[in-house]
Structures are given as C-alpha cells and as structure tokens.
A protein has these predicted regions:
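Conserved ABC transporter NBD signature motif
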Residues: 72-83, 87-88
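Conserved ABC ATPase "signature" region
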Residues: 112, 116, 121-136
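Conserved ABC ATPase signature
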Residues: 140-144
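Catalytic Walker B motif of ABC-type/P-loop ATPase nucleotide-binding domains
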Residues: 165-169
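ABC ATPase "signature
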Residues: 224-225
Length: 256
C-alpha cells in the first residue's frame, strides 16, 4: 500500500510544471505577497488574477527568480529559478509588457535575434503567421500598433519552443477578433502540452482559457480552484461578478 501511494506521489510530481510553496515578499513593513502556494500541471492553463496592486506582478517576478522572495520555495520544471537559470530559461518563455528596442529594428530582425539566444526554436515566420503578423515582417517594431506589439511579444515568448510560458496581461490592447485569434492559437498549443501561466483583466478570456485560477487580494490568496468552484462558493452566477466579489469585496459590498 505504501509503495502504491509513493508511486502516485511520484507521478503527480512528474506532472507538475510549476510548484510554489509558502512564498512571501515584503517591502519594508508592507507585505505584498503573503504565504502563497500553488501548483500548475503540464498542459494546464493557470490564471493569476487580482486588482491592480494585488501582488500579481511581484508574485510572477518571485516565481521567475527575477526578484528575490523573502521566503518560500519555487520549482519550474523541477529546477530552482535562481540557481539553474540558464538551463531553465531554455525551456521557459516570458512575454514582456514593455521593452525598449533599438530604434528602427525590424520585426524580422528582432525575431532572428531572439532565435539566436536558444538552441531549439520554433520558426518565427510560422508564429507570425499564426498570430496575424506575417505582413509586418519588414516593419519597424516602433511602427506597430499597441495590439500588434502585444501579439509580437507573445510570439517572442514562444520562439524558444518552451515547455511553459508566462503571459502577463495577455491580450491588452487587442480588439475582439484579435483576442479570439490569440485564444485559438494558445488553445492549440495547450493541446500539444504547453503549460501556460497567465494574468488577465478580461474575465471572458479567463473563462475561455483557464483550467484553474488563483485570485489575490492585497497579497493574500482569497480563492484557488476552478471557475466552476469559484461560482459555486459565491452568491453570484456570472464569473465577472464572482471575480469582483473576491478581488474587490469592499466595492461590491456597497452594491449588495
């Protein structure tokens, strides 16, 4: 019996792409990430949600190892982000919200420079076509619209052919059709086993893509589970109202 449960535990651990335990981060006397624990399985889409200032960005930075946590442990693909960065980031894609690129650098040049950083890559021309940017190949990045830049940043995150990708504010700046096109592309990648960790302020997007979610409020976990579980444990039936109830409870109480 003991061997049976040990086998189950090992299989579960092998299937876990991201594991975070008791993560904490403070700035002075202000705790911005308070004892957060989560796990994300292979091929799963996990959404980290919360109002501005809830601690989402700091949590992601601590998970990626770009910001030092005060305490807690993090593993991505079984590796410690702060100790095994080179090996880890061969297998992790990160979408950056804002980046300063050389003036007049072309889309194709930026993609080629990104490809040179990795051993095994996805053909960026295929990705540009999937995300509706193939006609911008020779365009300067500075001349792209906000929505086009957003899609390009997703493409750059996918170029290293990652096993897990972090997408921050996934489709901000995109129109309805472009957002749905991005959803479709990511759903196809998920079917191939890609693990996706995302943040978003669009609840229809979260409902469409996410297998599980975590909602933060002032650095604390106020909900963790599936969207169905979130709805069932609230007084609301629409997920957007459920999210507001969890993330911005004071505002909602004024209207109840």
């Amino acid at each position: 019996m003991l061997l049976f449960f040990q086998k189950i535990k090992e299989e579960t651990e092998l299937n876990t792409t991201i594991r975070v335990e008791h993560l904490k981060k403070s700035y002075g006397n202000t705790c911005v990430v308070n004892d957060i624990s989560l796990s994300v399985n292979k091929g799963e889409v996990f959404g980290l949600l919360g109002a501005n200032g809830a601690g989402k960005s700091t949590t992601i930075e601590c998970i990626l190892g770009t910001r030092q946590a005060d305490s807690g442990t993090v593993e991505i693909l079984g590796m410690c982000p702060t100790k095994e960065r080179k090996c880890l980031f061969e297998n992790v894609g990160v979408q950056f919200q804002e980046s300063n690129y050389q003036d007049k650098i072309l889309v194709s040049e930026l993609c080629e420079e990104t490809q040179c950083l990795y051993k095994e890559v996805t053909d960026y021309k295929i990705l540009l076509e999937q995300f509706g940017l193939s006609d911008k190949l020779k365009s300067p990045v500075s001349e792209l619209s906000g929505g086009q830049k957003q899609k390009l940043f997703i493409v750059l995150a996918l170029i290293p052919n990652p096993k897990v990708v972090f997408l921050d504010e996934l489709t901000t700046g995109l129109d309805t059709k472009a957002r749905r096109d991005v959803w479709k592309c990511l759903s196809e990648l998920k079917k191939k086993g890609l693990t996706i960790f995302l943040t978003s302020h669009f609840m229809d997007e979260v409902e469409n893509l996410c297998d599980r979610i975590m909602i933060l409020k002032k650095g604390n976990t106020v909900f963790s589970g599936t969207i169905e579980e979130a709805i069932a444990s609230s007084p609301y039936k629409e997920f957007e109202e459920v999210y507001l109830w969890y993330a911005e409870e004071e505002m909602m109480n004024e209207n109840i």
